[in-house]
Structures are given as C-alpha cells and as structure tokens.
Amino acid sequence: MVMTDPIADMLTRIRNANMVKHEKLELPASNIKKEIADILKREGFVKDYELIEDNKQGVLRIFLKYSANEDKVISGIKRISKPGLRVYAKADEVPRVLNGLGIAIVSTSNGLLSDKEARSQAVGGEVLAYVW
C-alpha cells in the first residue's frame, strides 16, 4: 500500500502508542522521520530513538518518555501542513505553541528546526507539526 503522507503516519503512530503508554514504537525509516525524532529528543518529548538498518528501508525505533508518576510527556501532537493544504510561515511569523510550552516543527532551508531554533536563526518555512 502506498502511503500518501508518511509524516502524518509517524505522528499518528506516536500519538496512538503514547495514549496506551507503550514504551517504544517502530516505524519505517526515512531521513525526514529521523530528523523529526531528533527534534523530539532535543526538546525532551521522547527518551531516545535508534535507526535499525536492514536490507530494505530500515526501521526507526522511538522510545517514548513518561514522567515519574506515569503521566504522558506528549499531551498532544498535530499535523499542520498537509499534502492537500501546505502551510508556510515567514521568519517573523513562525508560530508559538501554547505560548512556548509546546513546539512547532518547521521545515526550513537550514533543515528541520523547532520553532525556537527557526526564530533564533531568522528563517521561515513549512510548518509541519505542533507538539505539546
């Protein structure tokens, strides 16, 4: 089956695994998914991730993070720019998520960045997702 939006599939898998409190999840790997996982790790939303090489596409394993009393660290994750409706933001219009409590993942000319990194580098781009 052909996947029309692999980023939305990744975010849905993370949301579903998080809701049932799985320790980890696996999904087909790609460079953009690896970069999204790296941003989520840098911002403290996931514990870690690893890329498992096989003879095909590879598998990205993401380890979800929970607080000491089993509360979810990711309370929401939403795809913003979709294949049917792209959403772009200029450097001075990069959105804040929950007034800085969450992040926006932005695809820029400097690669994938969080909203804070995009603002500090003064670059805009396509707003891929919100995570809070």
From Swiss-Prot:
Annotated SUPFAM superfamilies: Ribosomal protein S8 (SSF56047)
GO cellular component: ribonucleoprotein complex; ribosome
GO biological process terms, semicolon-separated: translation
Molecular function (Gene Ontology), one example: structural constituent of ribosome
Gene3D superfamilies documented for this protein: 3.30.1370.30, 3.30.1490.10
Pfam families for the chain: Ribosomal_S8 (PF00410)
UniProt-listed InterPro entries: Ribosomal_uS8 (IPR000630), Ribosomal_uS8_CS (IPR047863), Ribosomal_uS8_sf (IPR035987)
Entry keywords, A to Z: Ribonucleoprotein, Ribosomal protein, RNA-binding, rRNA-binding
Family in the record: Belongs to the universal ribosomal protein uS8 family.
Function: One of the primary rRNA binding proteins, it binds directly to 16S rRNA central domain where it helps coordinate assembly of the platform of the 30S subunit.
HAMAP family: Ribosomal_uS8_B
Quaternary structure, from the entry: Part of the 30S ribosomal subunit. Contacts proteins S5 and S12.
Protein name, per record: Small ribosomal subunit protein uS8
Gene assigned in the entry: rpsH
